[in-house]
Amino acid sequence: HERLVGSEMCIRDRIHSSRTAIKNPVDYEARSNIMWIATWTLNTFVAKGKTTDWEVHMIGQSIGAYTNATHGMTLSAVSLPYYRFLLPYGLQKFKRYAVNVWDVNPDGKTDEETAEEGLSCMESYMKELGLVMNIRELGVTEEMLPGIADGTFVMEGGYKVLTHDDIITILKKSM
C-alpha cells in the first residue's frame, strides 16, 4: 500500500461501519461512524488541495428530477457505469483506489485489470448492502434518457468534461 490519504481512510471505515450496521442496525458506534464520515466527506475537508469530480452527482440529480428516487438511490444506480466510463481518464486514481481501499493485489495485472477489480469489489459491496444497481429500478425508461442528459449540469475540472453523448452512454449502461 501507498500511504493512505484521508479520503481512502474514510471509504475503508465506511465500508467496515456499513457492514456492521447492516448486520446490527442498532449498533450506535457503526452508525455514528457513518455519520461522522459523511460529515467529513460532504464538507469537502478530505478534498482540500485535490481535483474533485462531482459529475456523477449532477447525473444523479437529473435522474431524481424524473423519478421519486432519493439522491443516494440515483448515485448507487449510476456510479459504477460512470466510473467504468471514466476509468481510462483516471486510471492511476482508480488503480490506487483498488489497492488502497479494496486490498486488490496488483502483482501480475495491468493497471486496467487492477482498477477494474477494484470496481468489481465495489459492485459486490453495493449488492451486499442491497443498494439500487440500475436506473430501471428507479422507473427510468429509454424515452427519459435525452431529457435526463439535457438536465445534467456539466461541470469542469474532473477527469473528463462530459458531452451530451457521453451522458447518454453512461445512462444507457446504467439501465
Predicted regions and their residues:
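C-terminal charged capping/lid subdomain of soluble metabolic enzymes
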Residues: 101, 105-175
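Oxyanion-binding "anion nests"
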Residues: 14-52, 59
